[in-house]
Amino acid sequence: MERKNSSRESPRRLSAKVGKGTEMKKVARQLGMAAAESDKDSGFSDGSSECLSSAEQMESEDMLSALGWSREDRPRQNSKTAKNAFPTLSPMVVMKNVLVKQGSSSSQLQSWTVQPSFEVISAQPQLLFLHPPVPSPVSPCHTGEKKSDSRNYLPILNSYTKIAPHPGKRGLSVGPEEKGTSGVQKKICTERLGPSLSSNEPTKAGAVPSSPSTPAPPSAKLAEDSALQGVPSLVAGGSPQTLQPVSSSHVAKAPSLTFASPASPVCASDSTLHGLESNSPLSPLSANYSSPLWAAEHLCRSPDIFSEQRQSKHRRFQNTLVVLHKSGLLEITLKTKELIRQNQATQVELDQLKEQTQLFIEATKSRAPQAWAKLQASLTPGSSNTGSDLEAFSDHPDI
């Protein structure tokens, strides 16, 4: 019916429609040029839209409408960019004599294909406005910081303190500046310990003084190492500057401190601990030297020449002793050892008391003189009171 009505129209109306068609073609050309310029500015060019003719575009629109696909299924950014490019024009879609009307701004969230409103156009459309596709901007990905290499992270090694590091490994972490300062400290310690060592040595009347090129004795060398280790003053109330070697007479005045030969530092440490545990009264002079630090220093000042391996073991033992003393573990260990010794002695006394109680029960049950004699023999190493009680028991077996 629409085609019959269109054929019966007057030629004036047809000429007016032709004029309108030419005007629409001009407007379409202007819009195409503006869209091309906007595509060039945005860096995107749609080659397919330039090559296809209007008839091919209409066919493609027919196929898309048959499949139920709409232009508004594209991302919303395309419509926003199209509105920004043509703020005065409103976008529309024409599909074969059908104009899809847009809804209000509140219905932008809904798709046009759900409930569209159509308007039938009587004439063949000459204007087709398509939304230019714009690629979505790539959001910069925020890369996090690179994690540290798990192979270099060793939590077990970093959790515990090094009590006695090996001397060879200690020299690797020392910088050149620290080496220079340690050399100066060694020189100062040698100058301070030199006169004190020479004053204690017996000198003869006709003895020739030693030349400056004579190497220092090993005891002085070990004293330098102990000074570098940060060993505090060993004499009560003294300072590191007034530190002097201990002579053999001082050791003789301390009977509770017994030392083994310098060749066995482990035995010497055990004897030192046993000497500290003993409760025998010490002289005031020996009380000053009863600390484990003094014992380690005395071992380091021994006149015997150590080999390199023994010296390294000695230094490690001294480092361990100093660290244990500063952390308080040494005192805890000594107290624990003393408590263990007292516990063992108490356990022995309890065993003896159990045995004597068993003998007393047997003697009271049997009332035999042999049982009382056996009980008396078991109580003989006891006190005099127990002996008198035992005699009373033997005199009165009926008790």
From Swiss-Prot:
Keywords assigned by UniProt, alphabetized: Biological rhythms, Coiled coil, Cytoplasm, Nucleus, Phosphoprotein, Repressor, Transcription, Transcription regulation
Localization, UniProt: Nucleus; Cytoplasm, Cytosol
Region (Disordered): 1-85, 159-224, 378-399
Pfam short name (any one): CiPC
Residue numbers bearing the Phosphoserine modification: S213
Stretches of the chain forming a coiled coil according to its record: 333-359
GO biological process per UniProt: negative regulation of circadian rhythm; negative regulation of DNA-templated transcription; rhythmic process
Biased composition (Polar residues): 378-388
Keyword Cytoplasm set for record: yes
InterPro entries, alphabetized: CIPC (IPR031602)
GO cellular component, one term: cytosol
Origin: domain of life: Eukaryota
Known function: Transcriptional repressor which may act as a negative-feedback regulator of CLOCK-BMAL1 transcriptional activity in the circadian-clock mechanism. May stimulate BMAL1-dependent phosphorylation of CLOCK. However, the physiological relevance of these observations is unsure, since experiments in knockout mice showed that CIPC is not critially required for basic circadian clock.
Name this polypeptide is given: CLOCK-interacting pacemaker
Gene this protein is translated from: CIPC
